[in-house]
């Protein structure tokens, strides 16, 4: 039995170079280089323009591991080719963001401004004072940085003030009745 996700091959676009060395897979593209070690229960084969994940043995969880490995590899290929981005929106009076190089300065109603240093391979933009766009080649890192920024002031349930993802719906609670 083969995982439905792992059955689908990953197409390698032009301009992306994939190197398979045992369990270590390196993907190079215009946006950088990503390296990941895949679990030993999964075998990765490379043809001219495709990557295929196969179960290396018949252990109970190898189907799930093959599907996960395929999804991770597809994200690596897409990341170095087109990249990933997460958009955050700030809602609240006086909430502002400003990107300065590899730093993000936030004013979110605390007694002090919050300065965040971006990790290697991650860039941040602020098209307006209330919008933050986090970009990078590694989907996991981009999402983690966006989650760390949101965690500083998550949306509160009564007025909806805080930092939220662009597509996030905040369900507002009703205020206490007298």
UniProtKB/Swiss-Prot annotation:
GO terms for molecular function: rRNA binding; structural constituent of ribosome. Belongs to the universal ribosomal protein uL6 family. Keywords: Ribonucleoprotein, Ribosomal protein, RNA-binding, rRNA-binding. It comes from Coxiella burnetii (strain RSA 493 / Nine Mile phase I). InterPro entries: Ribosomal_uL6-like, Ribosomal_uL6-like_a/b-dom_sf, Ribosomal_uL6_a/b-dom, Ribosomal_uL6_bac-type, Ribosomal_uL6_CS. HAMAP family: Ribosomal_uL6_B (MF_01365_B). This protein binds to the 23S rRNA, and is important in its secondary structure. It is located near the subunit interface in the base of the L7/L12 stalk, and near the tRNA binding site of the peptidyltransferase center. Disulfide bonds: none annotated. GO terms for cellular component: cytosolic large ribosomal subunit. Part of the 50S ribosomal subunit. One of its GO terms (biological process) is cytoplasmic translation. This is Large ribosomal subunit protein uL6. Pfam families: Ribosomal_L6. It comes from the Bacteria. SUPFAM superfamilies: Ribosomal protein L6.
């Amino acid at each position: 039995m083969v995982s439905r996700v792992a059955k689908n091959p990953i197409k390698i676009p032009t301009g992306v170079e994939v190197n398979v060395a045992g369990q270590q897979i390196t993907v190079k593209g215009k946006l950088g280089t990503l390296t990941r070690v895949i679990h030993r229960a999964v075998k990765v084969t490379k043809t001219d323009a495709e990557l295929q994940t196969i179960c290396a043995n018949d252990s109970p969880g190898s189907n799930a591991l093959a599907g996960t490995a395929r999804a991770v590899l597809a994200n690596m290929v897409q990341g170095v080719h087109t990249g990933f981005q997460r958009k955050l929106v700030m809602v609240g009076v006086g909430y502002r963001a400003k990107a300065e190089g590899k730093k993000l300065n936030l004013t979110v109603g605390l007694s002090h401004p919050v300065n965040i240093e971006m990790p290697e391979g991650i860039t941040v933009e602020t098209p307006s004072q209330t919008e933050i766009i986090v970009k990078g080649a590694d989907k996991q890192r981009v999402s983690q940085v966006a989650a760390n920024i949101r965690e500083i002031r998550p949306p509160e349930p009564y007025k909806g003030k805080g930092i939220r993802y662009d597509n996030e719906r905040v369900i507002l609670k009703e205020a206490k009745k007298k």
